[in-house]
Amino acid sequence: KDALEHTGFAPK
């Protein structure tokens, strides 16, 4: 999992 998803950015 990317840390981006925690910041609100979901690459999926």
UniProtKB/Swiss-Prot annotation:
One of the GO biological process terms: shell calcification
Residues in the signal sequence: none
A molecular function GO annotation: calcium ion binding
UniProt tissue specificity: Nacreous and prismatic layers of the shell.
Keywords from the UniProt entry: Calcium, Glycoprotein
Post-translational modification: Glycosylated.
Keyword Glycoprotein: yes
Further information: On the 2D-gel the determined pI of this protein is: 7, its MW is: 29 kDa.
Role this protein plays: Calcium-binding.
Protein known as: Calcium-binding shell glycoprotein P29
UniProt source species: Unio pictorum (Painter's mussel)
